[in-house]
Amino acid sequence: MDLLIENARLVSMERGEAGYLPTPPARVGIQAGKIAAISAHPVGRDTPQIEALLSPQHYSQTIDLQGQLLTPGLIDCHTHLIYAGNRANEFEMRLNGVPYQEIAKQGGGILSSVKATRAATEEQLIELALPRLDGLLASGVTSVEVKSGYGLTLKDELKMLRAAKALEQERNVKITTTLLAAHALPPEFEGRADDYIEHVCQEIIPIVAEENLATSVDVFCESIGFNLEQTEKVFATAKLYGLHVKGHTEQLSNLGGTELTARYKGLSADHIEYLDEDGVVALSKSDTVATLLPGAFYFLRETQLPPIELLRKYHVPMAIATDVNPGTSPFSDLTLMMNMACTLFRLTPQEALRGVTQHAATALGYTNSRGVIKTGFDADLAIWDIEHPADLSYQVGAKRLVGRIVNGEYVSHGGF
């Protein structure tokens, strides 16, 4: 798709403060799904080379944004979008004072979703996921990470990953899949966590890698999940098969999972409410992103805040994601998460936008192809009818998305 965008106030997110401030009316040329040229100068006032690249004769479609805001497409770098079942009853239990850990010990929580997901077909899982995905797309999302983890058998984990990848055929969006077989201990392995981890490493990871069903492997490293030794075994196996690693770490306690994730050069360590300074230092010495999940923090009514000031002090990149899931974050709006990150965690609007663009791209391994508006990068963009990028964090509920561009293809969300 060849597309020329004119009169866009560009928020590139490329270079610090400058990349956050909207440019004067700019032009962006898109060819073969990539950004071919950018100019913030009036027509005829840029270099001859840039003017030639942006000549309308090279493009089959032109869109005049008339001063509307153009940002990178938003990236949701942590979701559990594929699942069956309903856990609204647990919401009431928590409101009555039953803690999440106790619900899980009673066989609720993740395992109730496991039962429903195992009973669903791949086609049913796709249909159930589409409304959730549509909510994300309506908030400007162009890339979504989707985890497995509600199957916990080889057959059902593969089913979930195939359903996730199939979403690309249903909607104009990029899907990245992550194996999260080490999400919870399935009933068949009750009391035998080491045996289950052996099963994950010997039976599930090799098939997932062979069939190219995931690019990363994640582990729920927590007191009600898997310990450090078990997590490390999964990480080591994933690396052996050429897969990236990610961690659900320090959500409910400090086990050192974040430091382990950083040691294995993980793409991201997610949740991190109980992360201490040693863990932050470990992140700062790696390329591992700290992913904040304010939806789960809010929904669980947690009080332990992630160490935002330490993350700033040590210059650790912070991503933000929805954590869409049936038990602890049933939210499908990434701009709502931006607002929560600002109001609950005290991020700035600039940090929030960078957290769902540049840093979210890094958390998925796309540092050099997504998350900023830059020549040579993927043409994944969002068009907004707003005055300033801070409005994305400030306003909640107002319909502000005009359209999305994915791989250079324009999709209207009420504009043009």
Swiss-Prot record:
Chain ranges passing through the membrane: none
Positions contributing to Fe(3+) binding: H78, H80, H248, D323
Cofactor or coenzyme needed: Zn(2+); Fe(3+)
InterPro entries, per the entry: Amidohydro-rel, HutI, Metal-dep_hydrolase_composite, Metal_Hydrolase
Binding site for Zn(2+): H78, H80, H248, D323
Pathway noted in the entry: Amino-acid degradation; L-histidine degradation into L-glutamate; N-formimidoyl-L-glutamate from L-histidine: step 3/3
Cofactor info, note text: Binds 1 zinc or iron ion per subunit.
Major localization listed first in the record, in broad terms: cytoplasm
Superkingdom in the source lineage: Bacteria
Any one biological process term the GO annotation gives: L-histidine catabolic process to glutamate and formamide
Catalytic activity: 4-imidazolone-5-propanoate + H2O = N-formimidoyl-L-glutamate
UniProt record similarity statement: Belongs to the metallo-dependent hydrolases superfamily. HutI family.
Biological role: Catalyzes the hydrolytic cleavage of the carbon-nitrogen bond in imidazolone-5-propanoate to yield N-formimidoyl-L-glutamate. It is the third step in the universal histidine degradation pathway.
Name listed for the protein in its UniProt record: Imidazolonepropionase
Species of the source: Vibrio parahaemolyticus serotype O3:K6 (strain RIMD 2210633)
